[in-house]
Amino acid sequence: MKRRDFIKTSALLAAAAGAGELMKAETMPAAKPEAASDPMQSDEPNEPFEDRLILSAPMLQNFAATSIGVAFAVSALANGYVLVGEKPDLSDARKFLCGGYRVTDIDDRVIRVRITGLKPATRYYYRIGADRIRYDGGYRMKILGNEEDSRTYHFTTAGAEADAHFCVINDTHARWEPFGLVLDKIAELAPACVIWNGDACNVEETVEDQIRIFLNPDIRRKDYASEMPYLFCPGNHDDRGMANRHLERVWMFRQPEERLPRDWDLGRNFAVRQGDMALIGLDTAEDKLDTNPIFAGLFTSGPYREAQTEWLRDALAREEIRTAPYLVAFCHIPLFDDNPRHNPGDIAPADKDPQYSTDFAYWQRTCARMWAPLLEEAGCQLIITAHQHRYRYDAPTADRPWAQIVGGGPDLGFTGSGDNRKEDPGKFPTVVEGLVHRGHLEIRVHNLVSGTIQDRFTFRPRR
């Protein structure tokens, strides 16, 4: 990506632009200089800085019919914002500030802006900016300067009139070669949204590690999510490490007002209408029990899954979800596996039993028992999962009326390493594409090693 040109403005203009009520959209007024006696004014409002303030392209996160998130990395203490409008020149732009109510979210690494009050299935244009902050105490703070990315981006909100086209990626594990292949395929297919179905991470201990994965990865397409909205179903590795315990510092939650008070902690679950499809996102959480001593009692996956069950019940009853002809659910760990050697994730207390090949969950029987009956009652046709690093399709049966796709992993046709490395044609990354075509939901599974479509499946509208 070429180095961006940044627009420098004075501290006075930045302060005036940020003076509106926090997180409330406002029409941008003409800037007016303030009196020189303003105690917030810097003696040198345009102090030169050698380092760029904005360090990454924006990433579109957790989109919905009337809201979307924008995140980007910064190099110093900053107060960020997004200008949003329906006109390409942003002459109708409204300004959204980072943070929640009362105070802005000043941060020295990641700016997160939640944009609400949007119209469904509507294209918007946007530009990101940030004010460089000097903070010396509760009564001593000032804006030193401002940067705006010179590029204008765009996005389209979800909704019943939106394009019914999605792609799913999974188990990228910060491995840049397969991740680059995945993003090249996404760019080629140009879906309306992408579901990142878990294990983007490994074990991330610092926010800088998370920035490297989501906002500034070591790939060619640095702006991969600047105009393509992403939804996220976390995997078990996305909970591991000190930083990942609060992944929302980089991948934001929805605002509390976007969900019921009961569901405030469920900031990443989604129920989105996208054209004729309803997309449901669930979090299977860890692949080990809360009682496993390796986690020292510091995980609470059990209650988390139960809370999602109540959320799912209500989400499936929502009018825009209930009336969609196609219902597709997403979660990281599979909800079905007929291999008797595969651990179902409910072997107390420490996940170990000699009849199983692993001491972690290969699939999630507990989640299946809680969620599958609700999805079946709603007529769900397909659940797309991940975790096992090997593509598989489980056709529906009389006892299990939904199909399951297990996405591939990051291995490029080989298993093992060093002297133990050997060819394995069943190991390849996938992009699972879904679109409504000729009155059916068509699913295409793209094999990124062979460059071919591995499988195609079609689903009729639900009853």
Go through each PLM region and give its residues.
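Divalent metal-coordination and catalytic microenvironments
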Residues: F72, Y124, D171, V194, ...
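Conserved, compact domain cores that house catalytic/ligand-binding motifs in diverse enzymes
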Residues: D163-C233, D238-D239
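Short acidic, glycine-rich surface-loop motifs adjacent to enzyme active sites
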Residues: E319-P340
